[in-house]
Amino acid sequence: MRPISSSPDTRVAGKARSYMVLAGILAVVLLALAWPRLRAALVYLPVNAAVERYYLDGKPPLAALQALQQRARQSAALHSHQEYWSGLALLHHLDAVYGEHPLAAQREAYEQSLAAADRALALAPVDPRTWLLRALAQNWLSFRDAGVVDSFAMSV
């Protein structure tokens, strides 16, 4: 006579339980691996909404510009992604154009915009909006080489 623990129903239940445990472990591992990217995306959500609103209606989010820059910087630090750097470049550009700053602070904002645009383009060089931001910053900073023309050409 067979022991009760080796009946077919018990073996099937044991296999099902082991598959459930394996699936649970796999889910935890995948969540742990995806957590930095997920956290960066959650931090970047308000920035993404503000950038999309700006492109739709043309009104810059001046009241929240510093907070949005901080969120974009934090997202890029958590997970370096082209969209985060491109959004940061746009926010610095808007700060330079619409901010009430002396010329030195305006120049610094354009330099930060150019640096963020360069980081974004290093990750994904096919974004015309970022090329245009780069060209505008280079033009304002009085770059006299062919780089400005090349940046404008890449934005078209």
Segment roles from a protein language model:
Residues 148-154:
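TPR/TPR-like (Sel1-like) alpha-helical repeat modules
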